[in-house]
């Protein structure tokens, strides 16, 4: 019996080390950033069982077998749709400003289509204004409404949007609603999901959280887009979830969330529609390719509106494109660069690009919330401040709530707005969307919004920053080491 237990013990020990060696080899064989690989190896060697389980759960990008098959199956028809769209030459911009030219070329080469012109844009910075505009557009809808949000939190004006959407469905408007399973857990536990389905709305719970399938698909891969398309002509996107900030996370101690949304009319709705079509097919298996732009209702003269490129990210979309776009925009800056983000955990390449811009004389400003709803990201962000300040970057800490806006403005002409945070999760993992706008008028509007944020912020003093307590520095470095995993 003693011999039996000895053999079993040795087999367990052998299996244990074989498992660690196997996972280590897999990490080394994967083409990932060195900091990310080192962080995973550290976790595995310090806490082997926890580290191995964590890596197998969230260490690699697994969309899931069924969704991966759907993603592969949809691309031939999607590619044909994109190719057919090129015949509508009147919607595509032929030239761009000098500051935007490189970025638009990058997007065209990687996504297969050029930026679209003739769009009308309106920036909305107040949640009530966003929801009131959305309700009006829903009430005037004639054919179809598609929505996707990371969070739908019942309460306040969000309920009024829900009521208007159900009323639209009852008058035979085709309504589709896709919500992330994790972000909208409160919605799916409420009566609203059943009420909407009973009204005729197609409600889809995207990327369902299922602990039984934790090793088959990444549970932290989330549908983070916020988009609305109405009649293939009107579109919304930006940082705002379908929540009333007066009722959302009031116990988090960070104040009301501050967001920015763009309301658009024009062919950009078609570009966003194909993104929604891909998401819908990956999640449901149903194909809903949008119709081509209607030349009878859309103006396409270059001078009549804004030129926009839509960048979509996530499994099945051009890999690393949003990261490349941010790098390209940063290196294109000649006069000034302003960034706003709630979560700042940049890649080494993006951090280097930002610091280099400041060191070559560009006026670089980053606006972050002073209080963050994520303790981990809040501390990790602080670990980058010393390097940024040393390079001459101005860091503004917003004090008017949790600044949730994601925006970049380059030289007053090139703008990026959407759902992408400047962190690893947004850059390489989640389903995200960003608008790239080449227009001085829109740039002036965005600059006014950012100036308002700065007026409600405190400029971080580099001299005081270096005097912060030692325990804060140690905590920052600890979270910095794990920043590639956040």
From Swiss-Prot:
It is a multi-pass membrane protein. Keywords: Cell inner membrane, Cell membrane, Lipid biosynthesis, Lipid metabolism, Membrane, Phospholipid biosynthesis, Phospholipid metabolism, Repeat, Transferase, Transmembrane, Transmembrane helix. It is found in: Cell inner membrane. SMART domains: PLDc. One of its GO terms (cellular component) is plasma membrane. One of its GO terms (biological process) is cardiolipin biosynthetic process. The chain crosses the membrane at residues 3-23, 38-58. Signal peptide: none annotated. Its EC number is 2.7.8.-. Residues 219-246, 399-426 form the PLD phosphodiesterase domain. It catalyses: 2 a 1,2-diacyl-sn-glycero-3-phospho-(1'-sn-glycerol) = a cardiolipin + glycerol. The active site is at residues 224, 226, 231, 404, 406, 411. GO terms for molecular function: cardiolipin synthase activity. InterPro entries: Cardiolipin_synthase, CL_synthase_A, CLS_N, PLD-like_dom, PLipase_D/transphosphatidylase. SUPFAM superfamilies: Phospholipase D/nuclease. Catalyzes the reversible phosphatidyl group transfer from one phosphatidylglycerol molecule to another to form cardiolipin (CL) (diphosphatidylglycerol) and glycerol. NCBIfam families: bac_cardiolipin (TIGR04265). Belongs to the phospholipase D family. Cardiolipin synthase subfamily. ClsA sub-subfamily. This is Cardiolipin synthase A. It comes from Salmonella paratyphi A (strain AKU_12601).
